[in-house]
Structures are given as C-alpha cells and as structure tokens.
C-alpha cells in the first residue's frame, strides 16, 4: 500500500500544526505510524491522497450516519449555501431541525443550537449550576464530554476525593468542583452524594460510553443515576453527542427509557458540519438568556448549512434505516468475534447498535479500569493490518467504531476477511 504522499503531507503538517494534526487522535499516536491524509469520501468509503480505498468505520467520529456525500444531504446543504452561509439572525432552518428533534425526543421541550459538542456540554453544565445554585458536578471516570475545563478531569484516589486536572492549563480551582466516580458503579456514586450531595448541581454521563471504547451500561445503572439525582436535587444531564439519533430515533434516551433534565447533542445532528445543541426541561431552559439570566451565546449558532445537513440526515433515518444498521452491525460484531476465535486471540467485542469496539482482553470490559487493562500493543498490530487490507478503524483502542446506512453486506464481508488476517498478525504480539 502506497503512503508516500501522506508521509510528505504529514511532514509539512508537523511544521504547521501541533503534532501535525488539528485533533490529537488523528495523529496515530496510540498506534504509531503515519496518519492517512484523506482526499475524498463517498458512501461507506474514504480515499487517501495516495489513491488507497478504505471501508470507513470512523465516519468522521460518528456524524456520517447516512454515509459520505449522501445526495439528499448534499442537495439540502447546497440549497442552503445558495441562500447564504451565515446570517447572525434567526432563520427558518433552525425551526425545521428543532421541530424534528422534539418530534423524536418529546422530552426536549426547548433547546439551543451551538457549534460543537464541547460547547453543548459546557453550556449544559453552566445552566445546571445556574438553575440549582450549586457549584459541583459529577462525571464518570473515562467519560469524555469535550475539551472544556470543567470536564477535563479524571478520577482521584477515591470516589470522595476532589477532581484533579487531566491537562496542563486546567486550574486546580476549576477541577476541584468536578467529582468523579467509576462508570457502572452505583454504590460509588451514592458515596459521592453522601459526601457532597448538597453542593452537587448535576451528574453528567455518556449513556453508552464511546470515548473509552464502547462501554455498555449495566441493567439499572442509568435509571439508578437518575434516581440519585432526584433524591438529592441535582440535575441529570445525558451527553448524547455521540449516541443521539445514532442508537435509535430517540437516541440512547429512547433506547433505555430515560428522561433527563438536560441532554446534549452533536455529530449526527450536523451530518458532518460543525454543530451541537443542548436542551431539556422547559423550566430549566427558560433560565437561559435572553429568557433568563444564565448567559450563553455564539456567533455561528444555528448555522443554516449545518441546520440543513442535520435536517436532511434525520429525515433519512427512518425505523427501517435503524433496522438495517442493527443487522449490519450485528453481522460485523459476530464476524469479528469469530475471526478472533479462529486466531486464538482473546477479545471482547462490545456493541450497542451501530457503535462497537474490539477490546484486546480476555475479561469483560465495563469501566475505565477494565478498558485500560487491554493489550494496546496487540490492538496496534491489528489496526495496522486492517488498514493495510482496506478497513479504516479508529486509530486507538479507546474509541468507538461506527457503521452507516451506506455500509453494505459486501463491506462487512470484506472487513471480516481482513480481520482474519489482522488477528493472525495480532497473535504474534505479546
């Protein structure tokens, strides 16, 4: 497989961008080697500058649920572009997308469009603090909610300790208001509430974790978090930036029967264009400016092209489309598990809907600690062998792979065939 042009571009990029990229995971740091520079995409495939063709399971980290360059999405975006790229004023397209969101998630009584998932989650945290008059928030170890300072915090030495910054540049005075607990561990969360309940404004979680690889919620966990929030007067924030409109027409909330106080969106609702949103209970959202005193604003919020892309994509995601996604995803997961067994490589294929991760572990993976115990060296060998055989997976053991309605049975068969060869390579690594 030729990579000369990607290598040359990466050399230039390293002179222009930190680490040669504009988002860290793209640099292949977790797997080694040179990232592929992508020149175009169509359907379920992407093509790099050297002419290599890959079945794409990154899908721009989730947004491309109907595949790349879907004609209906392209048409609606092109129509919007002809009308103007940004107005700095209300536009009809905001209402079209918002009505579609509320039709599928009626508990989102009011919402605010923003320009990224990070902006959505940091805004939701501010709203929760303003609404409750409390300062502390709780997140779960391994859950990623964007790059905002309050959320770049990992677990301390115990569930009752204050948060510690997970990045230089995050002040300790900010991080101390972020408390942490292990995902899937309700007793640990109960202890956090026992210690700090009167000061906790909200609990935020990924209902299905995607940023430690796919971690599946244990039965009763998500509702248990909701019940603890109710008991202690904290808001329940469900971060659906990754899962929203991907796992079902009602997102993870619809799939698991959740009714959060606030929910955040991104990715799929922009179909590849920059977008985010937060919304929820009417009484909470009515505290947001200009209706209320909690300030939030954005120059490009409700961008008409992003609204058009999201509207077109959501219209395409019918119940039949979700059934197709489920069948394809199940076939891929089963094929990967079987291929690993043939090579005598122990793996755990965690999947919910069209999100999945192949964990190189002989034990169940259900929280950050069990994910971190995986064999990342084997994953690296597997990743590069898959890449060599035309399957583009996330370049990290700790990320989710995605499928789209553009994927086909042939794509899945090609990927499983590549996996048989790739697991054989992984088996050579200790």
From Swiss-Prot:
Pathway named in the protein's UniProt entry: Porphyrin-containing compound metabolism; protoporphyrin-IX biosynthesis; 5-aminolevulinate from L-glutamyl-tRNA(Glu): step 2/2
A GO cellular component annotation in the UniProt record: cytoplasm
One Pfam family it belongs to: Aminotran_3
Cellular localization per UniProt: Cytoplasm
EC category: isomerase
Keywords: Cytoplasm, Isomerase, Porphyrin biosynthesis, Pyridoxal phosphate
Chief location bin: cytoplasm
Domain of life: Bacteria
EC numbers for this chain: 5.4.3.8
In-chain residues carrying the UniProt-annotated modification N6-(pyridoxal phosphate)lysine: 267
Single GO molecular function: glutamate-1-semialdehyde 2,1-aminomutase activity
Any one biological process term the GO annotation gives: protoporphyrinogen IX biosynthetic process
Catalysed transformations (reactions): (S)-4-amino-5-oxopentanoate = 5-aminolevulinate
Cofactor(s) required, per the database record: pyridoxal 5'-phosphate
Subunit structure: Homodimer.
Family: Belongs to the class-III pyridoxal-phosphate-dependent aminotransferase family. HemL subfamily.
Protein name according to UniProt: Glutamate-1-semialdehyde 2,1-aminomutase
Species whose genome carries this gene: Anaeromyxobacter dehalogenans (strain 2CP-1 / ATCC BAA-258)
Gene: hemL
